[in-house]
């Protein structure tokens, strides 16, 4: 079990680009190499559809399943997939918990989670427990307890997960990662961070437009 001090140190590395050297922090369970990754999407709203478009443009992916409770968004996603000449994926959207059935499908290797924030930790934990690689939109958690849920579940399952935060790969952020790896800061006991982005229109939007 991680101590809080160990967690702080690991978080500095995780938050600044763990994907570049995963073996430095946690042992991972790996699947055999495949020519095409079977990928599913939970949440195909504005953000999820953007991720779907990116996956469609890759020839090393199979879009095997989508999940959303909004039929209109499902229809939009299916249309994009059809226009690319791909096979129709499995569709899950009977209720808010239908994503659990998606995660049980043998046709899913990895999942992109782009639902409302309050669902991120719950869905990511479920994916890791199902042995499904998870890419989760920010913010991945809302509380300290949820942060620990992600850490503990990863350590228990060894399943890959990644925060879909492109800022991690900015040059200044990568410079900090390099400093952590070279032990410039020594043992990290306390740090502060923040999100410099006005989110009032996102958190209190009208439900129709993505930014109010």
Regions from the language model: what does each represent?
Residues 137-139, 165:
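Short beta->alpha connector loops at strand-helix junctions that form conserved
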Residues 117, 140-141, 197:
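Short glycine-enriched loops at secondary-structure junctions
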Residues 1-136, 148-160:
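N-terminal glycine-/serine-/threonine-rich beta1-alpha1-beta2 phosphate-ribose binding loop
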Residues 141-145, 171:
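Conserved PLP phosphate-binding loop immediately N-terminal to the Schiff-base lysine helix
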Residues 43, 47, 157-162, 167-212:
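Predominantly a Rossmann-like dinucleotide-binding segment in NAD(P)-dependent oxidoreductases
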């Amino acid at each position: 079990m991680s101590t809080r001090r160990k967690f702080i140190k690991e978080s500095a590395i995780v938050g600044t680009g763990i994907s570049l050297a995963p073996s430095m922090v946690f042992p991972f369970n790996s699947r055999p190499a495949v020519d095409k990754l079977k990928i599913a999407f939970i949440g195909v709203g504005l953000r999820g559809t953007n991720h779907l478009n990116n996956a469609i443009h890759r020839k090393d992916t199979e879009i095997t399943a989508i999940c959303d409770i909004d039929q209109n968004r499902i229809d939009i996603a299916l249309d994009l997939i059809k226009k690319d000449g791909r096979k129709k994926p499995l569709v899950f959207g009977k209720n808010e918990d239908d994503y659990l059935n998606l995660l049980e499908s043998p046709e899913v290797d990895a999942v992109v989670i782009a639902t409302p924030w309050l669902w991120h930790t719950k869905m990511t934990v479920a994916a890791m427990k199902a042995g499904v690689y998870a890419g989760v939109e920010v913010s991945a958690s809302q509380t300290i307890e949820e942060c620990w849920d992600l850490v503990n579940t990863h350590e228990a399952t060894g399943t890959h997960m990644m925060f879909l935060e492109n800022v991690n790969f900015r040059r200044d952020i990568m410079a900090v990662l390099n400093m952590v790896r070279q032990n410039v800061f020594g043992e990290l006991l306390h740090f502060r961070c923040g999100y410099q982005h006005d989110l009032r229109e996102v958190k209190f939007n009208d439900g129709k437009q993505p930014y109010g």
